[in-house]
Amino acid sequence: MEGATEKVFYSSFLRWLAKNNEGCSFNKIDNHDIGEIAFEWESGDEAVLVKFNVVGTVTQVTNSGKWFANTCSKKYKIPWRVFLCYDTDSPDKDISKFYQDDWKLLRDELKKAKAKEIVDLAACADIEDVMLIDIEGICKYLGISVPTELKGRKGKAKMKALYRSCGSTYHEGEKSADMVETLNFQKIMDDGPIDLHKLVDEIKVKSK
């Protein structure tokens, strides 16, 4: 995934999903001996190991293949499905360019490392645009009424303007966690620009 805010969003989404599905849990696992942080999704007798890799910049995309090979497939001899979470930087949903150049190299590396499946979670918007699908919830968190218009071209600028309107500052990454935890993820699933049902289907729960 592209950045730390995406990691906060997806981990919060999985916690929400577990909370709203009986018999499911999503918990952080700390392995202090090797400095590894992972997560585990449990549903009945089934457990799924979840690991996040934050790329940071597009130029680091190809390094994700080596990360997957070394920290996932070689270390844990289990079937792995890889979800590529990214912004298309385009108003349409054409993802053909994400099968070319560095992205093709990444996909080849993942296949070489025996990824069972590669799933695209592509959004024609940045992560703040996705979160702003629940603008009512964000405004409630900020203690303000919903504005008639949001200033800014992209989601990040809009989010910053929304926070400034009440004298607050929007911070990305872990500092956004308190706000993200309050989001209406059902609304985002239903109306958002990312097909989160792909993730739900993979961990074998029925979205409500």
Name each model-derived stretch.
Residues K7-K208:
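C-terminal accessory helical subdomains adjacent to catalytic cores in phosphodiester-
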Residues M1-E2:
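Short hydrophobic beta-strand that contains or immediately precedes a catalytic carboxylate
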